[in-house]
């Protein structure tokens, strides 16, 4: 059993955060909320999504798992106004999700979860540096880097966090000292990341006041932020681009 009501803009943002990684996901539904763990086909980026029951206007659920085509539900939610309420109910007999939004009623066919890639194991990483900054600053640096290169260097040197992109002839660099950051745990960190992935991953952070980046040297980066006034969380783990000498 699953029955819930949620703000349309919040649901759109949640779905968009997953759609940058994969097209199909397994939603794990429990009485305390919904969670998803997914990895992209190239095994470069992982998304971890949690939305507690308190993020919903109404929420009632037994433990179950459903498969959702993110492109379909994204198109469906496209007609919703930001302040609309989306009402959802699982019809277990037909394996469909009944959705009401903006006076319109939809029946969304669900996927068999067993046909979708299983949840990945989340690696336990010791990442020595941690940076907390405003999401808009992160988005701005990535947008600037896109114009120069297809990859971006991110690291910590002393009390300074930096993001840098170098092209054949041009270069862009953003440095933020401890006083410009919300928080900084200094540590040895310098890794190169693909902007093909970073560009999409940081899009949801533009509305976020605090984004936490955990970094190491030639290690994956963990990008973590809260949504729904702390009732939900989105995390991305992005593998570094290793260049041969």
UniProtKB/Swiss-Prot annotation:
<keyword id="KW-0235">DNA replication</keyword>
<dbReference type="InterPro" id="IPR000730">
    <property type="entry name" value="Pr_cel_nuc_antig"/>
</dbReference>
<dbReference type="Pfam" id="PF02747">
    <property type="entry name" value="PCNA_C"/>
</dbReference>
<dbReference type="GO" id="GO:0003677">
    <property type="term" value="F:DNA binding"/>
</dbReference>
<dbReference type="GO" id="GO:0006275">
    <property type="term" value="P:regulation of DNA replication"/>
</dbReference>
<dbReference type="InterPro" id="IPR046938">
    <property type="entry name" value="DNA_clamp_sf"/>
</dbReference>
<dbReference type="InterPro" id="IPR022659">
    <property type="entry name" value="Pr_cel_nuc_antig_CS"/>
</dbReference>
<dbReference type="InterPro" id="IPR022649">
    <property type="entry name" value="Pr_cel_nuc_antig_C"/>
</dbReference>
<protein>
    <recommendedName>
        <fullName>DNA polymerase sliding clamp</fullName>
    </recommendedName>
</protein>
<dbReference type="GO" id="GO:0030337">
    <property type="term" value="F:DNA polymerase processivity factor activity"/>
</dbReference>
<comment type="subunit">
    <text>Homotrimer. The subunits circularize to form a toroid; DNA passes through its center. Replication factor C (RFC) is required to load the toroid on the DNA.</text>
</comment>
<dbReference type="GO" id="GO:0006272">
    <property type="term" value="P:leading strand elongation"/>
</dbReference>
<comment type="similarity">
    <text>Belongs to the PCNA family.</text>
</comment>
<dbReference type="InterPro" id="IPR022648">
    <property type="entry name" value="Pr_cel_nuc_antig_N"/>
</dbReference>
<keyword id="KW-0238">DNA-binding</keyword>
<dbReference type="Pfam" id="PF00705">
    <property type="entry name" value="PCNA_N"/>
</dbReference>
<comment type="function">
    <text>Sliding clamp subunit that acts as a moving platform for DNA processing. Responsible for tethering the catalytic subunit of DNA polymerase and other proteins to DNA during high-speed replication.</text>
</comment>
């Amino acid at each position: 059993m699953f029955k819930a009501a949620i703000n349309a803009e919040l649901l759109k943002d949640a779905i968009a955060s997953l759609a940058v990684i994969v097209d199909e996901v397994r939603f794990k539904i429990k009485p305390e909320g919904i969670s998803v763990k997914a990895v992209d086909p190239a095994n470069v980026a992982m998304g971890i999504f949690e939305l507690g029951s308190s993020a919903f206007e109404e929420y009632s659920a037994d433990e179950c798992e459903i498969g959702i085509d993110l492109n379909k539900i994204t198109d469906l939610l496209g007609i919703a106004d930001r302040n609309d309420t989306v009402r959802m109910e699982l019809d277990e007999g037909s394996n469909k999700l009944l959705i009401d939004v903006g006076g319109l009623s939809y029946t969304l066919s669900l996927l068999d979860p067993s046909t979708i890639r299983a949840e990945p194991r989340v690696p336990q990483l010791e990442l020595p540096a941690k940076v907390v900054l405003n999401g808009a600053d992160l988005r701005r640096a990535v947008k600037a880097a896109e114009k120069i290169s297809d990859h971006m260097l991110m690291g910590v040197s002393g009390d300074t966090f930096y993001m840098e992109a170098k092209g054949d002839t041009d270069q862009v660099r953003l440095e933020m000292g401890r006083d410009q950051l919300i928080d900084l745990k200094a540590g040895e960190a310098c890794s190169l990341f693909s902007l093909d992935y970073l560009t999409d991953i940081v899009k949801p952070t533009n509305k976020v006041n605090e984004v936490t980046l955990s970094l190491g040297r030639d290690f994956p980066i963990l990008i973590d932020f809260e949504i729904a006034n702390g009732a939900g969380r989105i995390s991305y783990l992005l593998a570094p681009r290793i260049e041969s000498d």
